[in-house]
Swiss-Prot record:
Quaternary organization: Homotetramer. The potassium channel is probably composed of a homo- or heterotetrameric complex of pore-forming alpha subunits that can associate with modulating beta subunits. Heteromultimer with KCNH1/EAG.
Start-end of Basic and acidic residues biased regions: 871-885, 977-988
Organism: Homo sapiens
Effect noted on mutating T468P: In DEE112; uncertain significance
Transmembrane stretches, start-end: 218-238, 244-264, 292-312, 320-340, 347-367, 447-467
Positions of the PAS domain: 12-90
Effect of K324E: In DEE112; uncertain significance
Binding site for a nucleoside 3',5'-cyclic phosphate: 550-667
Function recorded in the entry: Pore-forming (alpha) subunit of a voltage-gated delayed rectifier potassium channel that mediates outward-rectifying potassium currents which, on depolarization, reaches a steady-state level and do not inactivate. The kinetic is characterized by a slow activation time course and a small voltage dependence of the activation time constants, therefore, starts to open at more negative voltages. The activation kinetics depend on the prepulse potential and external divalent cation concentration. The time course of activation is biphasic with a fast and a slowly activating current component.
Intramembrane residue windows: 420-440
Gene Ontology CC terms: cell surface; plasma membrane; voltage-gated potassium channel complex
Sites of Phosphoserine modification: S883
Protein name: Voltage-gated delayed rectifier potassium channel KCNH5
Motif, Selectivity filter: chain positions: 432-437
Length: 988
C-alpha cells in the first residue's frame, strides 16, 4: 500500500522540531518579527524553568524580555537589544534580568533572525544562558574554601559552551566542543532553519526508498532472485560443473549485483513504526544489521568459484554445491518487498503463477535426484530396471550401456530431456491431471509422489481455486484502502476539485491510514464492554493525563469519564483546525506536531507538544467565535473534548472542576483577540504623516473672483431647482404683512403680491404694462405674464414689515419697507389670515400683443376708501385653497398670529409711493433706454436655463424690469383707486 511504501512524505514545516532538536540543552523563545514589540509566539521548557514563568505567561510578551527588566538592568544594553530587533540583526549581549520571583540573574542572550522562503524575516530566535556564576565576585566570604571550588567546578561543567562563547576569539587556547545551537548562531543566518514548508530532505549519499531508481532496482533484484531460485536447485540436483564460461560469468555478475544491493541497503531510507521516513544514516545501518544483513550476506558468497577449479575433490565440490541452496534465502527479499508488489493486480497474478512454477521446478529437481540415486545400484553396480529413468530411456530410445573398460554405466537420456520429463511429471501431479506415461515404481518414488500430490492439491486449490477468497481474507484492509482511494479520486475528478486541495485530501487519507493501519477504532471500542472501553480510552489518552497538571487530582472514575469523551484527530500539514469566526466548541490538547495561530495574516502563536488551545468553557456561558486561524505545520495528533461533554463531567465531579479550572492554563485562548500593530502599518502611517507635513496647502480667499463666480453658479442652480418644484397651487400664495411707522406711530399695512404661473417658461421674462391708466402716475397693477396656458397659480406672501420713522416718504418709504421685508423674510410665524384685496384683471393690450396668452377671467380689484371690496370674484376664491394658511409652506399644525391691516394706511402709503415714483421715474427714464438692450440680451440667455422665483423680494421691484417682453409670470401689486389715478400713470 502506498502509505506503508512511501511513508509520510508531504511537505512539512519542521522549523520548531529542528530548533528543539538542536537546542535540547538550551533555553530559547521565538518572537514574531512583523508585529510591534515582537511578541513571543513560543518558548521551550528550558526557558520556563530558567525564568520561572509559565509558557502561557510568556506568550504575547515582548521578545526583548522587557517583562524581566528591573532596577539593575543596564539601560544601554536595553537600547542595544531594541536596535538589534529594529535592524533585524544577529547579536549577543550580557544582560541582567529578573525571574518571576524577582531574583536577579545574569543571562548571555543571543538574538538571531529567522527568514522564510522569500528571505523575509518573520521570527526572532532568542537563546539564554545563565552566567550568574561568572559575574558574581569570587573573593567574598560566601565563596571561600570548598564552596568556591564547588561553584567553579559546577560552572565549568554545566556552562562549558557559554565559557567558550565568552572567550575572545583571538586567543589561541584549547576550544571545547560547542553546543549545536551555538554553532548555528555563530555560523550565520544561512545555516539557521527557515520557517517554511519543505519536503523531507535526505542527507548526502542517502537514497529514498520510493524513488524511481530504487523501484527499478527492486524489480531487477526480484528477477535475479527468481533466477537464483531456479538455477541453484538445478545445479545441485544435476551436479553440473560450471565448465561453461558464459554461465560462470552470468552467475558471477548476479553475485556482484547482490553485493551491490547490500551496499545500497546501508544507504536507503525506510519507514519507521510511526509512518515517518527515517533518513538518518546511523539509524539506517543499525536497522539493516539487525534484520536482513546476515541472510543477504550468506546468499551472496561466491560458491561457484570453488567448482571452477579442475583439481577439486569431489566431496568438497559436492559440499559447496549443496551450499548453493543457501542462496534461496534471497527469496526473503521478495517477502519483505511483497507489499510493494501487491499494489498492482497483474503483479499479484504473475507472482502467484511464478510461485506455482517455482514449486514445480523444485519438485522436478527432487524427482530427478530420486531417480538418479535409484537407477544404478552402487553396491552391485547394476541397473534397476524398475526405475522411472530406465523406463524413460527405453521409451525415448536412449538406453543405458555398461562400459566394461571404465566399469561404469553410460548413455541414457540427456540432461535436458531428463529435466523436461521431471517437470512434466510434477506439473501433472500438482494439477491433479496425471497422464500416467511417467509413473513411480519404487517405494521411495511412490512416497514422494504421495507427498507431491498433497502439496499439489493444496497449491492448486489455494492459488487457482480460491484466488478471490484469498484476496478478500488476506488483503481485506488493503482492498478497502484501495477502494477508499478510488472513491476519493472519482469524487475529486467528478467535482473538479483543485489540484492543491486534491493533493491535501489524498495526503491526509494516506497519512491517516498509515497511522491507524485501516483499523476503525470506534468499531473496535463498540465491541468491548463499558469498563474495558473506558480502560482502553484511558490508555489511549495517557499522554494528555500525564503531561497536564490539571488532571493530577482527578479520580479514576473522573479520568475514565473524561477518557471516553476524548477524541483523537490526525491532521496533515496545512489543515485548518479552526477558521476565524467559527464557534469554538472543543478543547484541544497537542500530543505531537506543531501548529500556528494566524490572526490578520500574522503568526501570533506557535503551538507544540503539550500546548492547549480553545476556550475556557467552564467560565463562559456562551460559545465563542474563533478570533484566529489554527493551522497545522506538520503532521499533528490532537486529543479534543467537546464543550458539552466537558461541562457534563465538570458538573458531576465538582471537586475536580475547581482543580481543573485552577490548574489548566490555555496556551492560546481563541476567544480573546490579540491587539497589535504591524510594523509595516506604523511605517506607512509615519510616511503618510511626513507626506502631509511636507504637502503645500493651497487656499483661495473668500473675496476671490473665482470663488464668487462658482458661488453665483451654485445659487443659479438652486433657483432653477426651486422653480421646478412649484407645482402645488396652495403653496403658490403667500401673504406678506408689513408694519410701518409714521411720525413715531406704528402703522400696519398689507402688500398683496399675486403670482400667476402657467406652464414652464420657454422664453425670456420681461415686465409688460397691464393697466389702461399707465400714463397716469397711479399704477394699479403690474403684471408679469407667462407665454400661454390657462393653468395659473397664485402665490401670496404675508410678512411683517416695520416702517421706521425718518426713513423717507413715498417711494423711499416703500423701498425701506421692501428692505425690511427682506430682513424678515425668514420669519414665517407672522403669516396673517387677512383676506387678499388683489384681484386679477384682464389686460387687453397684452392679449392683443400675445395671441398665445389665455385671457384671465378675473377683473381688476375695485376698492374704496372704506376698504370694502366690490369685486364679485375674490382672490381667495380664484384658487382651490380657501384659507390663507393653506397658501403657506409652513406646516398646517403650526399656529400663526394675525395682524389686521387698515386699508387707510395702505392707501396713504401708495399715494406717497406714487409721488415718489413719479420723480424717480423721470430720473431713470434716460438710463433705462441704454440698459434695455443689455437686460434683454441677458434675459434671453438665462431664460432657457433659469426659472424666476416668485417669492423673491427682488422680483417685486418694477423699476429694473424692461417692459413689453411676452411670456412672463404675473406680479400684481393691488392698491385702492384714487381720483388721480389717471394722472399717475407712468410709461416705462
Amino acid at each position: 500500500m502506498p502509505g506503508g511504501k512511501r511513508g509520510l512524505v508531504a511537505p512539512q514545516n519542521t522549523f520548531l522540531e529542528n530548533i528543539v532538536r538542536r537546542s535540547s540543552e538550551s533555553s530559547f523563545l521565538l518572537g514574531n518579527a512583523q508585529i510591534v514589540d515582537w511578541p513571543v509566539v513560543y518558548s521551550n521548557d528550558g526557558f520556563c524553568k530558567l525564568s520561572g514563568y509559565h509558557r502561557a505567561d510568556v506568550m504575547q510578551k515582548s521578545s526583548t524580555c522587557s517583562f524581566m527588566y528591573g532596577e539593575l538592568t543596564d539601560k544601554k544594553t536595553i537600547e542595544k537589544v531594541r536596535q538589534t530587533f529594529d535592524n533585524y540583526e544577529s547579536n549577543c549581549f550580557e544582560v541582567l534580568l529578573y525571574k518571576k520571583n524577582r531574583t536577579p540573574v545574569w543571562f548571555y542572550m543571543q538574538i538571531a533572525p529567522i527568514r522564510n522562503e522569500h528571505e523575509k524575516v518573520v521570527l526572532f530566535l532568542c537563546t539564554f544562558k545563565d552566567i550568574t556564576l561568572f559575574k558574581q565576585p569570587i573573593e567574598d566570604d560566601s565563596t571561600k574554601g570548598w564552596t568556591k571550588f564547588a561553584r567553579l567546578t559546577r560552572a565549568l561543567t554545566n556552562s562549558r559552551s557559554v565559557l567558550q562563547q565568552l572567550t575572545p576569539m583571538n586567543k589561541t587556547e584549547v576550544v571545547h566542543k560547542h553546543s549545536r545551537l551555538a554553532e548555528v548562531l555563530q555560523l550565520g543566518s544561512d545555516i539557521l532553519p527557515q520557517y517554511k514548508q519543505e519536503a523531507p530532505k535526505t542527507p548526502p549519499h542517502i537514497i529514498l526508498h520510493y524513488c524511481a531508481f530504487k523501484t527499478t532496482w527492486d524489480w531487477v533484484i526480484l528477477i535475479l532472485t527468481f533466477y537464483t531460485a531456479i538455477m541453484v536447485p538445478y545445479n545441485v540436483s544435476f551436479k553440473t560443473k560450471q565448465n561453461n564460461i558464459a554461465w560462470l560469468v552470468l552467475d558471477s555478475v548476479v553475485d556482484v549485483i547482490f553485493l551491490v544491493d547490500i551496499v545500497l541497503n546501508f544507504h536507503t531510507t525506510f519507514v519507521g513504526p510511526g509512518g515517518e521516513v527515517i533518513s538518518d544514516p546511523k539509524l539506517i545501518r543499525m536497522n539493516y544489521l539487525k534484520t536482513w544483513f546476515v541472510i543477504d550476506l550468506l546468499s551472496c558468497l561466491p560458491y561457484d568459484i570453488i567448482n571452477a577449479f579442475e583439481n577439486v575433490d569431489e566431496g568438497i565440490s559436492s559440499l559447496f554445491s549443496s551450499l548453493k541452496v543457501v542462496r534461496l534465502l534471497r527469496l526473503g527479499r521478495v517477502a519483505r518487498k511483497l507489499d510493494h508488489y501487491l499494489e498492482y493486480g497483474a503483479a499479484v497474478l504473475v507472482l502467484l503463477v511464478c510461485v506455482f512454477g517455482l514449486v514445480a521446478h523444485w519438485l522436478a529437481c527432487i524427482w530427478y535426484s530420486i531417480g538418479d540415486y535409484e537407477v544404478i545400484d552402487e553396491v552391485t553396480n547394476t541397473i534397476q530396471i524398475d526405475s522411472w529413468l530406465y523406463q524413460l530411456a527405453l521409451s525415448i530410445g536412449t538406453p543405458y550401456r555398461y562400459n566394461t573398460s571404465a566399469g561404469i554405466w553410460e548413455g541414457g537420456p540427456s540432461k535436458d530431456s531428463l529435466y523436461v520429463s521431471s517437470l512434466y511429471f510434477t506439473m501433472t501431479s500438482l494439477t491433479t491431471i496425471g497422464f500416467g506415461n511417467i509413473a513411480p515404481t519404487t517405494d521411495v518414488e511412490k512416497m514422494f509422489s504421495v507427498a507431491m500430490m498433497m502439496v499439489g492439491s493444496l497449491l492448486y486449490a489455494t492459488i487457482f481455486g480460491n484466488v478471490t477468497t484469498i484476496f478478500q481474507q488476506m488483503y481485506a484492509n488493503t482492498n478497502r484502502y484501495h477502494e477508499m482511494l478510488n472513491n476519493v479520486r472519482d469524487f475529486l475528478k467528478l467535482y473538479q476539485v483543485p489540484k492543491g486541495l486534491s493533493e491535501r485530501v489524498m495526503d491526509y487519507i494516506v497519512s491517516t491510514w498509515s497511522m491507524s493501519k485501516g483499523i476503525d477504532t470506534e468499531k473496535v471500542l463498540s465491541i468491548c464492554p463499558k469498563d474495558m472501553r473506558a480502560d482502553i480510552c484511558v490508555h489511549l489518552n495517557r499522554k494528555v493525563f500525564n503531561e497536564h497538571p490539571a488532571f493530577r487530582l482527578a479520580s479514576d472514575g473522573c479520568l475514565r469519564a473524561l477518557a471516553v469523551e476524548f477524541q483523537t484527530i490526525h491532521c496533515a500539514p496545512g489543515d485548518l483546525i479552526y477558521h476565524a469566526g467559527e464557534s469554538v466548541d472543543a478543547l484541544c490538547f497537542v500530543v505531537s506536531g506543531s501548529l500556528e495561530v494566524i490572526q490578520d495574516d500574522e503568526v501570533v502563536a506557535i503551538l507544540g507538544k503539550g500546548d492547549v488551545f480553545g476556550d475556557i468553557f467552564w467560565k463562559e456561558t456562551t460559545l465563542a467565535h474563533a478570533c484566529a486561524n489554527v493551522r497545522a505545520l506538520t503532521y499533528c495528533d490532537l486529543h479534543i473534548i467537546k464543550r458539552e461533554a466537558l461541562l457534563k463531567v465538570l458538573d458531576f465531579y465538582t471537586a475536580f472542576a475547581n482543580s481543573f479550572s485552577r490548574n489548566l492554563t490555555l496556551t492560546c485562548n481563541l476567544r480573546k483577540r490579540i491587539i497589535f500593530r504591524k510594523i509595516s502599518d506604523v511605517k506607512k502611517e509615519e510616511e503618510e504623516r511626513l507626506r502631509q507635513k511636507n504637502e503645500v496647502t493651497l487656499s483661495i480667499p473668500v473675496d476671490h473672483p473665482v470663488r464668487k463666480l462658482f458661488q453665483k453658479f451654485k445659487q443659479q442652480k438652486e433657483l432653477r431647482n426651486q422653480g421646478s418644484t412649484q407645482g402645488d397651487p396652495e403653496r403658490n400664495q403667500l401673504q406678506v404683512e408689513s408694519r410701518s411707522l409714521q411720525n413715531g406711530a406704528s402703522i400696519t399695512g398689507t402688500s398683496v403680491v399675486t403670482v400667476s404661473q402657467i406652464t414652464p417658461i420657454q422664453t425670456s421674462l420681461a415686465y409688460v404694462k397691464t393697466s389702461e391708466s399707465l400714463k397716469q402716475n397711479n399704477r394699479d397693477a403690474m403684471e408679469l405674464k407667462p407665454n400661454g396656458g390657462a393653468d395659473q397659480k397664485c402665490l401670496k406672501v404675508n410678512s411683517p414689515i416695520r416702517m421706521k420713522n425718518g426713513n423717507g416718504k413715498g417711494w423711499l418709504r416703500l423701498k425701506n419697507n421692501m428692505g425690511a421685508h427682506e430682513e424678515k423674510k425668514e420669519d414665517w410665524n407672522n403669516v396673517t389670515k387677512a383676506e387678499s384685496m388683489g384681484l386679477l384683471s384682464e389686460d387687453p393690450k397684452s392679449s392683443d400683443s400675445e395671441n398665445s396668452v389665455t385671457k384671465n377671467p378675473l377683473r381688476k380689484t375695485d376698492s374704496c376708501d372704506s376698504g370694502i371690496t366690490k369685486s364679485d370674484l375674490r382672490l381667495d376664491k380664484a384658487g382651490e385653497a380657501r384659507s390663507p394658511l393653506e397658501h403657506s409652506p409652513i406646516q398646517a399644525d403650526a399656529k400663526h398670529p394675525f395682524y389686521p391691516i387698515p386699508e387707510q394706511a395702505l392707501q396713504t402709503t401708495l399715494q406717497e409711493v406714487k409721488h415718489e415714483l413719479k420723480e424717480d421715474i423721470q430720473l431713470l427714464s434716460c438710463r433705462m433706454t441704454a440698459l434695455e438692450k443689455q437686460v434683454a440680451e441677458i434675459l434671453k440667455i438665462l431664460s432657457e436655463k433659469s426659472v424666476p422665483q416668485a417669492s423673491s423680494p427682488k422680483s417685486q421691484m418694477p423699476l429694473q424690469v424692461p417692459p413689453q417682453i411676452p411670456c412672463q409670470d404675473i406680479f400684481s401689486v393691488s392698491r385702492p383707486e384714487s381720483p388721480e389715478s389717471d394722472k399717475d400713470e407712468i410709461h416705462f
